[in-house]
UniProtKB/Swiss-Prot annotation:
<dbReference type="GO" id="GO:0003723">
    <property type="term" value="F:RNA binding"/>
</dbReference>
<keyword id="KW-0694">RNA-binding</keyword>
<keyword id="KW-0539">Nucleus</keyword>
<keyword id="KW-0548">Nucleotidyltransferase</keyword>
<comment type="similarity">
    <text>Belongs to the TENT family.</text>
</comment>
<dbReference type="GO" id="GO:0005737">
    <property type="term" value="C:cytoplasm"/>
</dbReference>
<dbReference type="GO" id="GO:0005654">
    <property type="term" value="C:nucleoplasm"/>
</dbReference>
<keyword id="KW-0808">Transferase</keyword>
<comment type="function">
    <text>Catalyzes the transfer of one adenosine molecule from an ATP to an mRNA poly(A) tail bearing a 3'-OH terminal group and enhances mRNA stability and gene expression. Can also elongate RNA oligos ending with uridine molecule, provided that the sequence is adenosine-rich. Mainly targets mRNAs encoding endoplasmic reticulum-targeted protein.</text>
</comment>
<dbReference type="GO" id="GO:0001701">
    <property type="term" value="P:in utero embryonic development"/>
</dbReference>
<protein>
    <recommendedName>
        <fullName>Terminal nucleotidyltransferase 5C</fullName>
        <ecNumber>2.7.7.19</ecNumber>
    </recommendedName>
</protein>
<dbReference type="Pfam" id="PF07984">
    <property type="entry name" value="NTP_transf_7"/>
</dbReference>
<dbReference type="InterPro" id="IPR012937">
    <property type="entry name" value="TET5"/>
</dbReference>
<keyword id="KW-0206">Cytoskeleton</keyword>
<dbReference type="GO" id="GO:0045596">
    <property type="term" value="P:negative regulation of cell differentiation"/>
</dbReference>
<dbReference type="GO" id="GO:0005813">
    <property type="term" value="C:centrosome"/>
</dbReference>
<dbReference type="GO" id="GO:0005634">
    <property type="term" value="C:nucleus"/>
</dbReference>
Amino acid sequence: MAEEGSSTKDSESFSVLNWDQVSRLHEVLTEVVPIHGRGNFPTLEITLKDIVQTVRGRLEEAGINVQDVRLNGSAAGHVLVKDNGLGCKDLDLIFHVALPTEAEFQLVRDVVLCSLLNFLPEGVNKLKISPVTLKEAYVQKLVKVCTDTDRWSLISLSNKNGRNVELKFVDSIRRQFEFSVDSFQIILDSLLFFYDCSGNPISEHFHPTVIGESMYGDFEEAFDHLQNRLIATKNPEEIRGGGLLKYSNLLVRDFRPADQEEIKTLERYMCSRFFIDFPDILEQQRKLETYLQNHFSDEERSKYDYLMILRRVVNESTVCLMGHERRQTLNLISLLALRVLAEQNIIPSATNVTCYYQPAPYVSDGNFNNYYIAHPPITYSQPYPTWLPCN
């Protein structure tokens, strides 16, 4: 009975895509995506279908078996619900492979880089281009994670418009989603097999069965959340520091909490994790600037609203941080918001702004000196912790 219950629960995670969804998936896989090179390197014109088939073929030739290939993230959400509010930014592909040693990690990286040679324009002398050169020219981000619970690597190919092609090679990973609406993965193998073997074009009456999975656990519930723009998750204590930024991104796109009572607990978890993962103010600044660049590159008007929402959440839900550190982060967010307004030339004129000043009580003290002598900033290290454990 236990096994039957487990099987039923697992089956709830999967769903068969309808024709409209398969059609959108076909469009995503066959759309030409430019990979922009640095310096004098030419732009590569690729499709997800071609890069997947090339990389998978070379991996198997090298002795690495690919269990399956999946479309992940916002692109998968776009396939399932076209106008879902999330857009279709990064094009995330997951290759499930075995990565038992460092040799496999290195082999995967070399295979991907060498695969890029296939997409160079005609006339380019490929013999003189090394994998290291290709990495410097076309790779925006290269990540390798090896822990007790996670073994995976990521190679992100550059796109100036923010539509990076991200190839993720996963042996094991503890958590693959933050919220139910970004928990979807679409298994591509049946469609890739169709491309390889079918002589007929894909159509409503002639297409393969394509399966989608929600890592949230309940596909129908997660699908309902995506359709109705609801925010929900499971085991929020497992969400990494970037979850706070994603949560604020959902709020600025008019998503709303599915459960108002649970959301404050969720916010406190995410704020605590953000400051644990990014304790230094410079780290926080880099993280925020990178997030804005990657997720709002063509949405300048939304940046300010996003930062104000993030500031409100940090201000209301931060419980594990010392007061001065919290104020420092709030000030950082405010300065970034001011910079966004300056870049958009919409800072209000001072003639239209009314400032209210309430003198502090100590001003009435006869010994109070209202002159301030500026001193250069003093750089010092902090030997004490900047966050406190939550109860």
